[in-house]
């Protein structure tokens, strides 16, 4: 019976395996475009959008999709593509650059990073120098604690490299103190020996066996003492070697030679100036600073001088041009006689005589006045530059007159006073007439009193022969009296010429 039950169970399991298991999955993922059927897990997987790549074979959702970046780029925490760093020479790659993790670079073994950078190091440094020993080991980011070696594990002086290291590092810190009961003669040998050692090879130190006459004390083994004092004792005067002999001068292991080498090294270290770079203080060369300061002062001074000189010259030129302009503007213009065209005004020929009222006799006929030249440009008779014909002396009627003084033209308009002669039978009335002078012409000798003068009357009898000639330079009206022929007792006739 039990065997029958077992066979039935196996048959049932075989029937279950015969049914297809992917049929319901296909129907479930077929209508959803964001999922697709997975082959490995036999279920629906999430379809990542374009530009994103799945982080696992069958992503379950958007969390399993990441941005697809170019090679040597990774997706940072913000979901952006970021370039991976490149390991510089002297660095090693600790982690490679992948799609979701950056590349990490670190210093080589035996060095630590003293200037860190993002996923890298900008400057690496050795943990300990050659003369130091490791006290506490460090890592790529933490420095190793180093210390100086102890006196027991000091360098071997028999090695030439160690001797050079000892000479270059230990000698400047040693402060030798000479203690000796020797007299002045023994001390005077020291500079002589130092002078002789300049010619020898002073780079090698020779071990001197300890003796009762020469003892060299070792430096203090205390590492906390930064400055070590070396105390040297000179031998007694009796035990000093004779340096005058050739045998003693050739001994390389003599006490005086060793002492002189130490003193020579100490003297050279004391006389050598300390470099400012070794002490860590900033060094400023005053040469370029002084040069640039001098250049700035020179440029400022020359610029100020040129600016002041330019302003002074400009002011001087402006004053000069202003004066020249004033002189050209107000310069008096000389009027010449022949500068304007002349017009000859002909007077009508009139023949007549004047009868003297007191005697009743006829006087000589009056000759007409000469022709008058007028200035067409001005508009008034310009007679001030024309000589009078009847004014020449009797001896020489053709002798020229002196040229009249030129008139200065102004821009004002003044009233010109001229005398008018009115002839009657027994009286002559003398008065004044106001005339306008054109612009640019100023009458000579005119005053305000003459402009405001009233009419004056003179009752003295005058005749045509006694008339005064018109003044020089008068371009205004000229009036005189004539008597026409055939008429008696006729009033005065006025002839005006303009």
From Swiss-Prot:
Disulphide bonds in the chain: 69-81, 84-97, 87-105, 107-121, 128-146
Residue ranges, annotated region (Disordered): 142-168, 204-256, 338-370, 389-411, 436-498
Residues carrying covalently attached carbohydrate according to the record: 156, 183, 229
Entry-annotated residues carrying Phosphoserine: 339, 353
Biased composition (Polar residues): 242-256, 338-358
UniProt keyword annotations, A-Z: Cell membrane, Disulfide bond, Glycoprotein, Membrane, Phosphoprotein, Receptor, Repeat, Signal, Transmembrane, Transmembrane helix
Ranges per topology, Cytoplasmic: 309-498
Tissues expressing this chain: Detected in thymus and in activated splenocytes.
Name of this protein: Tumor necrosis factor receptor superfamily member 8
Organism of provenance: Mus musculus (Mouse)
Gene name for this UniProt entry: Tnfrsf8
């Amino acid at each position: 019976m039990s065997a029958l039950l077992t066979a039935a169970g196996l048959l049932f399991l075989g029937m279950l395996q015969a049914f297809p298991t992917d049929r319901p999955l296909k129907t479930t993922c077929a209508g959803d475009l964001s999922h697709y059927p997975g082959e490995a897990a036999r279920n629906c997987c999430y379809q990542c959008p374009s530009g994103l790549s799945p982080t696992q074979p069958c992503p379950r959702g958007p969390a399993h999709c990441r941005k697809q970046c170019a090679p040597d780029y990774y997706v940072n925490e913000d979901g952006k593509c970021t370039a991976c760093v490149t390991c510089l020479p002297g660095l090693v790659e600790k982690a490679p650059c992948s799609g979701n993790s950056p590349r990490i670079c670190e210093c080589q073994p035996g060095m630590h990073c003293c200037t860190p950078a993002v996923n890298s190091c900008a400057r690496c440094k050795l943990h300990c120098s050659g003369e130091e020993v490791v006290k506490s080991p460090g890592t790529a980011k933490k420095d190793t604690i180093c210390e100086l070696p102890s006196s027991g594990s000091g360098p071997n002086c028999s090695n030439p490299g160690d001797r050079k290291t000892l000479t270059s590092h230990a000698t400047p810190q040693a402060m030798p103190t000479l203690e000796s009961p020797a007299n002045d003669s023994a001390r005077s040998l020291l500079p002589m020996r130092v002078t002789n050692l300049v010619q020898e090879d002073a780079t090698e130190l020779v071990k001197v066996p300890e003796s009762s006459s020469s003892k060299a004390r070792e430096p203090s083994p205390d590492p906390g003492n930064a400055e070590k004092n070396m105390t040297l004792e000179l031998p007694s005067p009796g035990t000093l070697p004779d340096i005058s002999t050739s045998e003693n001068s050739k001994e390389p292991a003599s006490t005086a030679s060793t002492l002189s080498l130490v003193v020579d090294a100490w003297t050279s270290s004391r006389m050598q100036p300390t470099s400012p770079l070794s002490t860590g203080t900033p060094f400023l060369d005053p040469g370029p600073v002084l040069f640039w300061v001098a250049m700035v002062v020179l440029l400022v001074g020359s610029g100020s001088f040129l600016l002041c000189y330019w302003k002074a010259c400009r002011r001087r030129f402006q004053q000069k041009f202003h004066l020249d302009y004033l002189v050209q503007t107000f310069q008096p213009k000389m009027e010449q006689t022949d500068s304007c065209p002349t017009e000859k005004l002909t007077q009508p020929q009139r023949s007549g005589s004047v009868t003297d009222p007191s005697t009743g006799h006829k006087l000589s006929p009056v000759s007409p006045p000469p022709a008058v030249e007028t200035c067409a440009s001005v508009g008034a008779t310009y007679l001030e530059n024309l000589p009078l014909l009847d004014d020449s002396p009797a001896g020489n009627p053709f002798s020229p007159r002196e040229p009249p003084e030129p008139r200065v033209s102004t821009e004002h308009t003044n009233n010109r006073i001229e005398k008018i002669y009115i002839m009657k039978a027994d009286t002559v009335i003398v008065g004044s007439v106001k005339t306008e002078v054109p612009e640019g012409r100023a009458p000579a000798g005119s005053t305000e009193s003459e402009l405001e003068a009233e009419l004056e009357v003179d009752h003295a009898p005058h005749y045509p022969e006694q008339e005064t000639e018109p003044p020089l330079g008068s371009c205004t009206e000229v009036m005189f009296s004539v008597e026409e022929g055939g008429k008696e007792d006729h009033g005065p006739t006025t002839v005006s010429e303009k």
